[in-house]
Amino acid sequence: MSKDGVKNAAPIGIVCKGKDKLGCRLFVGTKNLKNIMETRRYVVNITFDPINFVNSTIGNLDIEEFTDDDDLAILKNAEAYVICDVTDIRKMDPIKDHVTSNGEAYIISSDVVEIVKNHPCAKALNRGVFALLECLTNYTRLDLVSKEQQDYFIGRFNENNRMIKRVSGQDTIKAMEILKNSMIKKGFDVE
């Protein structure tokens, strides 16, 4: 939410840094970074709504998607949400990675102020699990496709594996290692 009370939401990756401690990396130019720098507070909405994911990625959600809370951007259909107060905003050294050539970004460190579960089984999505599912689907097709398509699947595996090592829990990382070993046994050259 902006300092002027304009609510917005966008998918971001949150990393658990310890008990009641969260962190994230936000790139310069995003509304989220601007708002967090201005207000030093934000809400992590946990939702499974694919329409909200798309709309909040390509633009902003309609005001009707948010609750009537005056000072927080809480989604009406959130499975759960976490209110965070920023403890530190640190500019990262410029990096060149798969996302951007200049890598101008900030690391946001936060304390969890409150956790609200609207549904008893609320669980955050992790893109690593979906990347694993993509890799598993591609794996089942490796013996059925052309060499060109195999190379594409291997490239996707390598990229997904790199990402999973950064954003996923140990179970997903271990699952990718098992899949990698099986691919190597089949004669595929994976990283």
Regions found by a protein language model. Give the residues of each.
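Basic, polyanion-binding surface patches
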Residues: 1-81, 85-191
